[in-house]
């Protein structure tokens, strides 16, 4: 009986040792799958556009201007910006968000990737530039919509609402609030998938 008990203990010990070795292999394999942000930005996204080139290439149309008038500044500008980003392949985009909760944004500018400041200065500049491109469409809208300047015309109401919304926030407090909302929407659509 002692010999039989002894053999069982040896067998159980070997099973435990085999299980431990197997667990170590699994553990080691999972460590090899860590995400490297610098590699993603500098290698995978090395051909991404610069933020200024992205804004210049963004093709806004009268529908974008009208959307700002209908939905408001935040929704309209967010839609135009995100639509432009979504039209690009992920590795060609000039903006990536590495942490949605903290809104950590990385922007390619002057051919190098940089983390945007805590105030999101580069992204705010890009948002203002997109907003200005939108405002420039007001003249085209006027030409295609005669009667916009007549008080009793329905087009006048549409034009005035569109113009007010296209101009953006009226003061610094509203600007900070609206830009914060736009940045959150951009961040949600540019979050890096860490697969």
PLM regions with names:
Residues 1-22:
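Intrinsically disordered, low-complexity regulatory regions of eukaryotic transcription factors
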Residues 20, 26-195:
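Extended amphipathic coiled-coil helices
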């Amino acid at each position: 009986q002692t010999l039989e008990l002894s053999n069982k203990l040896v067998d159980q010990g070997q099973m435990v040792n085999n299980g431990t070795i197997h667990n170590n292999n699994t553990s080691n394999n999972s460590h090899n799958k860590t995400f490297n942000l610098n590699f993603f930005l500098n290698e995978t996204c090395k051909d991404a556009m610069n933020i200024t080139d992205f804004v210049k290439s963004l093709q806004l149309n009268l529908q974008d201007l009208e959307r700002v008038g209908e939905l408001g500044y935040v929704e309209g500008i967010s839609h135009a910006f995100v639509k432009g980003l979504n039209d690009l392949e992920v590795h060609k985009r000039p903006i990536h968000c590495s942490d949605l909760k903290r809104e950590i944004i990385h922007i390619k500018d002057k051919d190098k990737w940089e983390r945007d400041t805590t105030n999101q200065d580069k992204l705010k500049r890009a948002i203002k530039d997109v907003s200005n491109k939108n405002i420039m469409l007001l003249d085209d809208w006027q030409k295609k919509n005669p009667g916009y300047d007549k008080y009793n015309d329905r087009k006048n109401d549409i034009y005035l609402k569109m113009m007010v919304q296209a101009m953006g926030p009226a003061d610094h407090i509203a600007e900070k609030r609206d830009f914060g909302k736009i940045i959150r929407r951009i961040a949600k659509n540019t979050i890096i998938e860490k697969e």
